[in-house]
Amino acid sequence: MGTVRSRRLWWPLPLLLLLLRGPAGARAQEDDDGDYEELVLALRSEEDGLAEAPQHGATATFHRCAKDPWRLPGTYVVVLKEETQRSQPERTARRLQAQAARRGYLIKLLHVFHDLLPGFLVKMSRDLLELALRLPHVDYIEEDSYVFAQSIPWNLERITPARYRADEYQPPNGGSLVEVYLLDTSIQSGHREIEGRVMVTDFESVPEEDGTRFHRQASKCDSHGTHLAGVVSGRDAGVAKGASLRSLRVLNCQGKGTVSSTLIGLEFIRKNQLVQPVGPLVVLLPLAGGYSRVLNAACQRLAKAGVVLVAAAGNFRDDACLYSPASAPEVITVGATNAQDQPVTLGTLGTNFGRCVDLFAPGEDIIGASSDCSTCFVSRSGTSQAAAHVAGIAAMMLSAEPELTLAELRQRLIHFSAKDVINEAWFPEDQRVLTPNLVAALPPSTHGAGWQLFCRTVWSAHSGPTRMATAMARCAPDEELLSCSSFSRSGKRRGERIKAQGGRRVCLAHNAFGGEGVYAIARCCLLPQANCSVHTAPPAGAGMGTRVHCHHQGHVLTGCSSHWEVEDLGTHKPSVLRPRVQPDQCMGHSGASTHASCCHAPGLECKVKEHGLPAPQEQVTVACEEGWTLTGCSALPGTSHVLGAYAVDDTCVVRSRDVSTTGNTSEQAVAAVAICCRSRHLAQASQELQ
């Protein structure tokens, strides 16, 4: 795979030291800075006093980028288990160095992580991977890989709500209470657009540029970062004109960086946050590389510390879940649209899409600061520009409500977006139902959102077609899982259920025999002071429907689901509501376990809406009225031809097979049933604040 295999040298350590001290030994090293010599000298005491670990099989796992040209063999991030002590990374690194030296290998320790995640970055032969994976405390090892900048004035008008548009862009505030960290190339901080608004930190961690003839012209090295800084907070073309920026250089003059450099940059931010806590922080990640477990884990750690991370979805016209940091659930991932609200096309490529994208934003022909001169402007395109727009909007939202959590901010961004404006035909057919049809916009005002019950739909990864395959969707830690549904393109599924896992509730969907796979779909809501539970009824006797309702007084029904434990063809009727009989009851097939999701929260009230047509339809929908939020979606009555039910914003969608091939009769027509809820408590509290 492009890696040079090192020769095994079984020389005594003193002889190895003499060779390293000589000129020939120095020339043989990959680095010429003398660090290897100091390393081996330091290992004498380690080798004398440290017994080698028993040769057990490796329990840790190894990960590398799926795209071979992006890989960096020879550099590895070693991640330790979470419960390890703060001093453990250094101790484990020394142990690895000592054991490698006994085998005739040298390891260069490049960085030790403490504040972001426990681990270290090393340069070593791939021959040592098996040894490293067997070390105690090691959770996994990831090979380093490249990340890339994602760039290839209608934009300001587009993010302003229509009812507030005027002749010029007039944001509700400038985002002055928020600090935005930009991980990018270097920045021309003297440009008139961003002068006095950007602090260029001393952080720099970039790989060498490709090619010996590449000239590091300032205008090339600064171009990407300068443009994005102008989009976020530029005087004339910026979104959040009052936000302050701090730049970290993690991309070289060609717009290329590494996963390890990005990790070190994120740790730099975390260290600053610990040393000098400030107000809300937004981190803009206008870059993308192959899927990286360690980079996603680092984003998760930073998000838990209260930092909002906004990332480019990527410009590869591909599933964003295949790239990092776009695939990290804790990151707000942004795709790119043009002035007509259509997905951006960049030659043969274009914006990424799929379930890992949260929303889209302007990303084509965006005017911003140019590094060619201090008064120059340039037009650029890509998901980097789209992410910069959302970072600016987030800065303004956080300035208006500094106490917003990541979950609350994400829900507001989704709620206030322009909906159903993107032509879904641009996306691959299998991605259309997974990709959000949302274009970012500012909220209509800085107040008045507190009364709203916010919910979003979270899709799982595809389960795969194996016989007993399952899919799992989960909400963010600050969100409540109010309902669970499933979807299968073949229609063969064994239903879904809510299950407790690791102290949290998750939505599980089950594939059926002969099925092509299934998706789990979670409805995740912000419901303060909620007390939620799931009540289950086992399968009823033959010919009898299974019924279940909320047992506790004051609890209301927010969703229904059911599943079959025994193997079948997935043709049983799914759980359904009978709103005309008992609106707080779920009813399912006699062979299925039926589950009622019930919640109690101050002022929470829910109702059921049903919509059906007398003739079979491939899709039936029912929507909640304004002021009500969809929490549950199911089919009524449900037949073998139902593919599944899912929520799109506040609309319940029930999909069936193509009626031209199924031979449906009018008696088999499917109706959509929505559970719509609102919180009178939140509305009252909002009115009192006003």
Swiss-Prot record:
Pfam families associated with the record: Inhibitor_I9 (PF05922), PCSK9_C1 (PF18459), PCSK9_C2 (PF18464), PCSK9_C3 (PF18463), Peptidase_S8 (PF00082)
Annotated Peptidase S8 domain residues: 153-459
Span of the signal peptide: 1-28
Positions bearing carbohydrate: N531
Active site: D184 (charge relay system), H224 (charge relay system), S384 (charge relay system)
Residues where Phosphoserine is found: S45, S686
EC class: hydrolase
Family: Belongs to the peptidase S8 family.
Free-text comment about domains: The C-terminal domain (CRD) is essential for the LDLR-binding and degrading activities.
Record's protein name: Proprotein convertase subtilisin/kexin type 9
Taxonomic lineage of the native organism: Eukaryota, Metazoa, Chordata, Craniata, Vertebrata
Gene: PCSK9
